[in-house]
Amino acid sequence: MEWLSGFLDQIIAFFQWIWDFFAQGIYDFVRDGLVVATKASMYAALQTLILLIDVSYTAARELIDSLGVPQMIRSMYAALPGPIAAGLAFFGVPQALNIIMGRGGDALLHALRAVHWEVIRVDQDPSRPQWLLQNLRRDPG
């Protein structure tokens, strides 16, 4: 008769496991699924943002270069009277214009590095450059 009580205990344990799954397990299962879906959507959003940053930077650079904006700014700045040019040079306006017009992408990368993020290029296919935004903080938390 001991085998019968062991068998009934196994049946009761099975039904208890099913009851626990319906009581708490479904919630945990759905929550874990939503966590995975949220991680995937955040990753996709970051990858899309990186792609859009690359596309918009390239488009803006080509537009600015085709319109001749840097040459026009240099010629207009050279036409300024001496005291005004000296005042602007004191406040660093020429350097700011040079950064904006010449190396805007580098300034963006330096700003990202300042907040411990880095954009790295991951090329598996040279015709389609891919970028990866990487956190530079190495702390486990």
From Swiss-Prot:
One of the GO BP terms on file: symbiont entry into host cell
Keywords: Host membrane, Membrane, Transmembrane, Transmembrane helix, Viral penetration into host cytoplasm, Viral penetration into host cytoplasm via pilus retraction, Virion, Virus entry into host cell
Membrane topology: Multi-pass membrane protein
Keyword presence, Mitochondrion: no
InterPro entries in the record: DUF2523
Transmembrane annotation, as ranges: 3-23, 33-53, 80-100
Cellular component GO terms held in the UniProt record: host cell membrane; membrane; virion component
Protein location: Virion; Host membrane
Pfam families linked: DUF2523
Subunit structure: Interacts with G3P; this interaction is required for proper integration of G3P and G6P into the virion.
Functional note: Plays essential roles both in the entry of the viral genome into the bacterial host and in budding process. The formation of the G3P-G6P complex termed adsorption complex is essential for correct termination of filamentous phage assembly.
Family, per entry: Belongs to the inovirus G6P protein family.
Protein name: Head virion protein G6P
Organism lineage: Viruses, Monodnaviria, Loebvirae, Hofneiviricota, Faserviricetes
Gene for this chain: VI
